[in-house]
A protein has these predicted regions:
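Short, glycine/charged-enriched secondary-structure capping and boundary segments
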Residues: 24-26, 48-51, 115
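Core residues of folded domains in eukaryotic genome-function proteins
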Residues: 4, 29, 42, 115-117, ...
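Feature captures the FAD/FMN-dependent oxidoreductase FAD-binding
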Residues: 73-146
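Conserved Rossmann-like nucleotide-cofactor binding loop
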Residues: 16, 41, 144
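Short, solvent-exposed loop/edge-beta patches enriched in aromatic
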Residues: 26-30, 39, 93-95
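N-terminal Rossmann-like FAD-binding beta1-loop-alpha1 element of flavoenzymes
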Residues: 3-35
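Glycine-rich active-site loop/strand segments that organize a redox cofactor
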Residues: 38-88
Length: 146
């Protein structure tokens, strides 16, 4: 079982996780962080659901990132447009190397003695468990359980 420590673990690489990572990188540049994503792609809901008429229920001027204004004239965006927006945000911020794909958190324990979180994470590709420790866990897992 491998072990690694970072200051912050972000769980989920959807819209919330990408936003959290952006703010960690820009507002806390001295802090180390990783993003754990259970699937093999960023985007969460917007990557998972690919039926032809998927679209946002909220306008993208509100749903989008404050640090990356939505520029498309369509306020209610389709899924592929939202995915393009998210991919661009990850690319522009250089976040791809911070994302560990195929990682599912199976247990999180707080150690008062060590003053950190210890997470047991399943690598779904190798089926091996990894142990990661951190000072903070930022849960960005979204609404759906997949």
């Amino acid at each position: 079982m491998s072990s690694e420590h970072v200051d912050v673990l972000v769980v989920g690489a959807g819209i919330s996780g990408i936003s959290a990572a952006h703010h960690l990188q820009t507002q806390c540049p001295d802090k180390s962080f990783l993003i754990l994503e259970g699937r093999d792609s960023i985007g969460g809901t917007w990557d998972l659901f690919k039926y032809p008429v998927i679209r946002s229920d909220s306008d993208m001027y509100t749903l989008g990132f404050s640090f990356r204004p939505w520029r498309d004239p369509k306020a209610i965006a389709d899924g592929p447009s939202i995915m393009s927006y998210l991919r661009s945000a990850v690319e522009d911020d250089g976040l791809h190397d911070k994302i560990r794909f195929g990682r599912k958190v199976v247990k999180a324990l707080w150690s008062s003695q060590e003053a950190h979180w210890e997470l047991t994470v399943l690598n779904t590709r190798s089926q091996q468990e990894e142990t990661l420790t951190c000072g903070f866990v930022h849960m960005c897992t979204g609404y759906y359980n997949y």
